[in-house]
Each structure stands twice: as C-alpha cells, then as structure tokens.
Amino acid sequence: MGKVIGIDLGTTNSCFAVLEGGKPLVIENVEGGRTTPSIVAFTKEKERLVGQLAKRQAVTNAENTIYSIKRFIGRRWEDTEQERNRVSYHCVPGRDKTVDVKCWGKQYTPQELSAMILQTLKAGAEAYLNETVTEAVITVPAYFTDAQRQATKDAGTIAGLNVMRIINEPTAAALAFGLDKQEQREQVLVYDLGGGTLDVSILQLGDGVFEVKATAGNNHLGGDDFDNVIVEWMLSEFQAQEGINLNEDKMAMQRLREAAERAKIELSTRPTTSINLPFITAFSKGGGEVGPKHLKLNLSRAKFNELSRPLVEKTIDPLKQAIEDSGLSVDQIDRILLVGGSTRIPEVQEALKKFFNGKEPDRSINPDEAVALGAAIQGGVLGQEQEVEDLLLLVVIPLSLGIETLGEVFTKVIERNTTIPTSKSQVFSTASDGQTSVEIHVLQGERAMANDNKTLGKFLLTGIPAAPRGVPQIEVSFDIDVNGILKVSAEDKGTGREQGIVIKETGGLSQQEIERMQQEAEQYADEDRKRMQRIELSNQADSLFYSHEATLKDNQGLIPQKVKATANKKKEELMAILEDPNVELGVIQTRLEDYRQAVLSMGSEVYSQGSSKSSARDYETVGEEEMTRETGNSQESNAAFSTQPEGTVNNDNLELEAVFSTYNDHTQGSDVATSSHDEIDLGDASDNSQTNFDLDDEDFNPFEDFDEEEEASTDDYEAVE
C-alpha cells in the first residue's frame, strides 16, 4: 500500500496532507498554496478550472463558477432554499429531489463537482510524492448526515480514490493537536467554525486513545454567513446612497462577496477597513447616456461585531449541548482547540473566552490546516505506519437513529453519541390484525414525533403471515460502519423473510452512475494533460522564436539567404498551426522540430562562416608557427565549450558563444516555467529538447551535429601547417 493522504474537503477551502516520518505534513498545491479554494468553473470554451484559477475569474464568469458546493452535497432540494438563493450559479432539481448545478447546458451533481476538487488535490499529492495516490481519508463535519457522508465517499470514488475512512473534522483536528501528547489524559473541546459549518466535539485524550464523548453543531453556520452579513450591509448602504438595488446583478454580487471576504479577514487584525469597488454598476443619465457608479464604504470592527453578533450567539448553543451531553462541566474542559479559518474572528474568540470563564483557547496549530493534518495521521494508522500504530480513534454518531412506530412516534434504536462502528436490534410487531406487510421508515434526529425528524429512507417488508396484531415478531437491525454509513434490515422471525436498505437515498448514486462519472473525470484529466502538453510546446516555440530573432540580429551577414528563408518559412508554418486550437499535438511537435532544425542550421552557418573568416585572418597576419598555435587554441576552445557551453574561452568564438548562450538561456527559461509539470509526456519534442539543450549534462555539446564542419576546418589548418 502506498501513502494514504488526508483530505480536508472544505466549504470554502480544501487542504491535503500526508504522514512523513511519523509527522503530518501539509502538501502545497501546484501554485504553492497550502490551501486550495473549493471552487470549480467552466469557461465558455468548455474548459474546466479548479481552485485559484477558478476563483480569479469568478467576477467575469459568475454564473458558471461554483463555490460552497459542500452546502448542497447529500441534501434535498426543499432543504436548501436559503443556500440556493445566495449563490450566483444556476441550481436545478436533481435525482431523488436533490440539488444539481447547471452550467453551459449540462447538469452536474455535487458529488461530481466535489470530485473535481478532489482530483486536483490528488494530482498535487502525486506530484509531491512522485507516486500514484489511490487511498485517502476524507473529513466531514461531525453533524453531517448519513446521506451526506455517503455522497462525500461517492465523490472520492469518482475522483479515483479509495476512501478508506470518513472521519469527523473535530476528531481529525484533535488528532493533530494531540499527537505529541498521547500520555496526558485530558478533556478537550474542539470548536470548528469553517466556511459553511460549525462543529463542536468533546474528546477524552490519553494513552493513545481518542474517545469522542459528545458532538454537536450547526450545518448551516460558517464563514460564508459572516461574509453574507457584510454583503447585506453593503447592499443596504449602496441603495441608501444611490437608490440602486444590486441584488439582481450577478457580476456585482460576486464582487461584493469577494470584497466582504477580504473585509472580514482584514478586520481580524485591523480596527477598520475600506471597501472600494469602482464601476460596480452603471446607470442611465437620460437621453441614452450611461454612466458608472462606484461603491466606497468604510467598515469598522465594531460595526462588523454588531452585524455578526446574532451569528456569534448562535455558535454558543452547540457548545452548551455538547457540554451537557458529555456529562462534564465547563470547568472540567482542559483545553479548547480552535479549528477553521472563521475562528480568527475576534468576536468569536471573545465569546468563547467568556463562555469558558476566561480560559484561553489553544491556537498552536494553523486552524486552516489542523483538520487535514489529523486526517493524515488517521491515514497513517490505516496505512499501518509504524510511528502511529498505537493510536485508537473512537467516534460517535451525532444524532439518534430509529424508526417510525404506531402513532407517528419516533422510536430510537441507536442513541446519539454512541461509539461507532456499532450494531443494534429491536423487535417490533404489527399494528393491526391480519397485517401482511410493514413499512420501515428510518429516521435521524432527537424529536419525539417522526415528522419532526429527518427521513433517511423507507423500505417495505412483505409476506408476513396474517395474524392478530402484536403476534408477528419483526426484528429491525441497525448497522453503522466506521465511516458512519448506515444499513438497516428487517426480518420476520416466523418466516425468515428479510428486507433491507443501505441509507444513501439523499444524493446517493448508483454504481453505474459512479462509474460514468469516473469515466468523465478521467476524460477531463486527459483533456487537462493535453492542454498542458500544448502549453509546453507553445513555450518551446516562443523560446525558438526569440533565439531565431537574436541569431538574425547579431549575425545577419554570416547566414546565407537560403538558410534564412527556410527558417522564416518554418517559423510561419509553426505560428499558423499554433493559432489553430483543433490541431493535433503530433502535428505541432513535427512542425516544432522542423523549425528547431532550421534554427540550428542557422547556428551551423554562423559557426562555419565565423571559423572560415578566423582562419583566413590568422593566415594572413600570423606566420606558419603562429597558425599552428592558433589551431591548437581553437581545438582547446571547442573542448571546453562542450562541457561548459556558457563559459568564455576564446575571444575568436565570443560572438558565436553569445548566440548559443542566448538560445540556451531561453530554452532553460521554458523548462523552469514548466517544472511543475514534470509528469507530462511531451513525446519527441521533449526528447529533442533534452537532447539538444540539456545544460546539466556533462557530455552536452551544442555543436555535436556539426562535427563534419569542425573536422573540415581542422583539416584545413593541418593542411596549412
């Protein structure tokens, strides 16, 4: 088994890490960032962008830039109205009344879109580790339902990952904080306020055991909500000043969202911030004239605290519930761990400090990275890394599970905060005489009545022999695995007839759908690879264009007209096919190689003409003995130039040396620019580039193709001698 990576698939940003030498290490993405925006975009050219690239173009492509998709994964259409009204992209009903996203005429499930983000993280891990990555541990909010967990696992499968474990984000964070403190027995509260969710978990750490005592949270409260209060304030202020409502302007709304996020971040360290958005909209002056409108506002931390106070107060309720469920008091909590970027908000920190009677939270680990680090540790456990074999993680379910019984009552089978994996059964019977079938309505929640809890699924057990009510014995079994995936079965003890269901209906995908999405994901990966190959070839062409022009400029009189004409023709052919987006890569490689050979021929002529002139000049001005000495110097210079092509050895070769030094400098520049794509197979073009211009090769000789000219020149010298 290779390395198991840990992935924090966040609402606004994602992070991935791996265990190296017993220590978790965050992996930087290809752009050098330690977190990757959880954003996917589709351009009008049908190009797919992920991460920072997608975020940069969000303002100009708001309707086709998908963010916060985690808020929709595994959820029903009717449960997401508030979230749907906040996004700029087009949401449509999906299968099983879930939420899909429509871009350029095609529908995407949240699983597919999440898989695109996971694919990007997977590629980054493979580039860092220099090996194929197939296993992962993915984190989810503690309050994620079974359907949301299953949908997240499906996303990993679509991305080509074997999701070995789905673990709760607060639990993962506790692993990151507690790795070096395993011998200390502590009661730890993890407060995880991310981009879209709030999770609170209380764990007992010690002796290598991480036991979750209680968990609570809010799946609809996070950093996005703090951004939204700033957006609403800006909308209100702008309408008051200008009388213009920006709500229907999607481009303006996207700019407001980005400005709100920046303002929120700045107010974590500054007392006030300025929000300047020039040309936010246009207005009619009358007579057909249109003029611009600018938004310029100042927001103080005090005002932000006032706007966000209701949100901060909402974060306290899960704290109270978790404390109560754990059976502990506030004073018995030894440590408070802050996780998630939104915990940087000063008002949130003050509220926590007040709730815990002045106890300072632990900020020793970057809150953006703690969850991914913990997931990497769990990955090390599952991957049997020796350094962490003694860790044991005991996770609990956040909400009770049960079925609907007579009178629409919710009867619990597994109580909340039960450690998983677990399996429990209860025996039920029929509610009326002669009843031959029963519907098993599986629910999740804490309310007494079935209608007040969340439906997970329904199935029918038929073929029950007719009997008086209360006589048939029907055993209902609940089985939850380590990932929190629930299986429910019902068996008639009299006949042995059994029926069951794996709870995955909310956003669940069939195996065929998952396979189809995997194929599409692979197709996109192939398209991405081809696009990078094309960019690499284009970069090589640009280097050749520059070298071509430099050689002509510095050595105009040394190159025959026929050779120049050939090189110019090859250049025009290459430029023409580079303009065609549909041309095959093989054609580009062929034209590039033809042009490269033409440029090399120019260099050959420069070398040949330069050597001839040098020989004639030396013969005229120096005696026979002096000519022999110059011949020796020329041979010595060539030998030195083979191993140190950029060094200056002989003044006679200085001009020639400068020409090829310029060429090689720019070829190297192209290699540096594409060094992050070492895995790309560029075929012959790449091979030729290495053959001709690998300056790190000790045997490198830029003139090895011109041995005949060198030998001829040397023979001439010997003849003179």
Swiss-Prot record:
Keyword Lipid metabolism: no
Source domain of life: Bacteria
Gene3D superfamilies: 1.20.1270.10, 3.30.420.40, Actin, Chain A, domain 4 (3.90.640.10), Substrate Binding Domain Of DNAk, Chain A, domain 1 (2.60.34.10)
Region (Disordered): 606-649, 667-721
Keyword Transit peptide: no
Molecular function terms from GO: ATP binding; ATP-dependent protein folding chaperone; unfolded protein binding
Description of what induces expression: By stress conditions e.g. heat shock and by hyperosmotic environments.
Residues annotated with Phosphothreonine modification: T197
UniProt keywords, alphabetically: ATP-binding, Chaperone, Nucleotide-binding, Phosphoprotein, Stress response
Biased composition (Polar residues): 630-649
SUPFAM superfamilies according to UniProt: Actin-like ATPase domain, Heat shock protein 70kD (HSP70), peptide-binding domain
One of the Pfam families matching this protein, by short name: HSP70
Biased composition (Acidic residues): 694-721
Function: Acts as a chaperone.
Family: Belongs to the heat shock protein 70 family.
PANTHER family, alphabetized: HEAT SHOCK PROTEIN 70KDA
Protein name, UniProt field: Chaperone protein DnaK
